[in-house]
Amino acid sequence: MECIFCKIVAGQIPAKKVKEDEHMLAFHDIDPKAPTHILLIPKRHLASLAEAGSRDHALLGHLLVKAAEVAREQGLDRGYRVVISTGPDGGQTVDHLHVHVMGGRPMHWPPG
């Protein structure tokens, strides 16, 4: 197993977890880009959004619902940003789908 996020799911690498269920794990990003920066990952390896198919509909919806729950639990009442980076040009740096929840400061547009 070479995927760092799969190793986190397996408990081989520690993470500061904030939420977990049978389908996903949420934890603090080790290189935060906002005062609150949480990653949500599916427990099943899925390389990116580009590789998602019809069998992933429920999982993707679940991740978004859990992202909103995490934002509420983290006190992001004034707003937050949800990001899924896909592929090298999209800024994806880990080949395991992950949802960023960022907040705690004004999030400007365009992002960069």
Show the residue positions of the predicted features.
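HIT superfamily nucleotide-processing domains
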Residues: 1-112
